[in-house]
């Protein structure tokens, strides 16, 4: 039986994603290999520096106070502990960081509080 590469490629081209997944699993079992990407040989410290680290510190940025400015000022005061004048100045000067270098859960809670007050805000 002669191997016809073109026929094989045509058959692969007509397969669905599920069929291709099953094919990969069968090849892995048959030949004892893995479809996982291998690390390039000889990649030293330069490759290690290229690894993307998961971000652990987040900033909550107030983009706009919206129509409920008083509610947003109250929320900013609660989140930051600032006085009334400082919180008003922060809100008036948007876009500004409300909280900086905080954990993801804290950033999400602060964002939720600002959004509920009527502000436009985001996490960076």
Curated annotation (Swiss-Prot):
GO terms for biological process: translation. Pfam families: Ribosomal_L12, Ribosomal_L12_N. This is Large ribosomal subunit protein bL12. Belongs to the bacterial ribosomal protein bL12 family. The keyword Ribonucleoprotein applies. One of its GO terms (molecular function) is mRNA binding. HAMAP family: Ribosomal_bL12 (MF_00368). Homodimer. Part of the ribosomal stalk of the 50S ribosomal subunit. Forms a multimeric L10(L12)X complex, where L10 forms an elongated spine to which 2 to 4 L12 dimers bind in a sequential fashion. Binds GTP-bound translation factors. It comes from the Bacteria. Keywords: Ribonucleoprotein, Ribosomal protein. Forms part of the ribosomal stalk which helps the ribosome interact with GTP-bound translation factors. Is thus essential for accurate translation. The keyword Ribonucleoprotein applies. InterPro entries: Ribosomal_bL12, Ribosomal_bL12_C, Ribosomal_bL12_C/ClpS-like, Ribosomal_bL12_oligo, Ribosomal_bL12_oligo_N_sf. One of its GO terms (cellular component) is cytosolic large ribosomal subunit.
